[in-house]
Amino acid sequence: MSIPFPSAPADKEALENAGLFSPKFDAHGLVTAVVTDARDGELLMVAHMNAEALSLTLETGIAHYYSRSRDKIWKKGETSGNLQTVKEFRTDCDQDAVWLKVSVAGHDATCHTGRRSCFYRTVELSNGDAVTKITDDTRHFDPATTYSNT
């Protein structure tokens, strides 16, 4: 079953107040999804959701996203066992982005690299170049083993 999301109201006040969830999809039919750990607030990932992913997430309580590179719905953690159970689902004032507070099953890892968060690097300026530096290299699972059959 797919939830019929209404178009965003033209009235800004109606959009910003409580009422029907009416996501404002971009030209590609997507909204940005920010995902944090419900337990400690750590930023885990940023992804995109289309109407189907939003519906599946709301209906099942398990996070689903839209993969732009694979052009399909993706149930986060389906292969690795690190499913994301949604504890709280929020939207911003314009309803063009959502924030999922999740608990992560399995290895408690969100990133396909095996790390807890996709944000495991800092960006710094070094000798005039922007460079990345790994700040969390703890691997919670081995991606080569986990994704060997995908």
Curated annotation (Swiss-Prot):
Any one biological process term the GO annotation gives: L-histidine biosynthetic process
Name of the top EC class for this enzyme: hydrolase
Needed cofactors: Mg(2+); Zn(2+)
Catalytic activity line of the entry: 1-(5-phospho-beta-D-ribosyl)-5'-AMP + H2O = 1-(5-phospho-beta-D-ribosyl)-5-[(5-phospho-beta-D-ribosylamino)methylideneamino]imidazole-4-carboxamide
Residue positions binding Zn(2+): 93, 111, 118
Superkingdom to which the source organism belongs: Bacteria
GO cellular-component term (any): cytoplasm
EC numbers: 3.5.4.19
Subcellular location per the Swiss-Prot or TrEMBL entry: Cytoplasm
Keyword Magnesium appears in the UniProt entry: yes
Keyword entries, A-Z: Amino-acid biosynthesis, Cytoplasm, Histidine biosynthesis, Hydrolase, Magnesium, Metal-binding, Zinc
Cofactor binding comment, as recorded: Binds 1 Mg(2+) ion per subunit. Binds 1 zinc ion per subunit.
GO molecular function: magnesium ion binding; phosphoribosyl-AMP cyclohydrolase activity; zinc ion binding
Residues reported to bind Mg(2+): 92, 94, 96
Annotated metabolic or biological route of this protein: Amino-acid biosynthesis; L-histidine biosynthesis; L-histidine from 5-phospho-alpha-D-ribose 1-diphosphate: step 3/9
InterPro entries per record: PRA-CH (IPR026660), PRib_AMP_CycHydrolase_dom (IPR002496), PRib_AMP_CycHydrolase_sf (IPR038019)
Family according to the record: Belongs to the PRA-CH family.
Function: Catalyzes the hydrolysis of the adenine ring of phosphoribosyl-AMP.
Self-association state and partner proteins as the record states: Homodimer.
Name under which the protein is recorded: Phosphoribosyl-AMP cyclohydrolase
Upper classification of the organism: Bacteria, Pseudomonadati, Pseudomonadota, Alphaproteobacteria, Hyphomicrobiales
Name of encoding gene: hisI
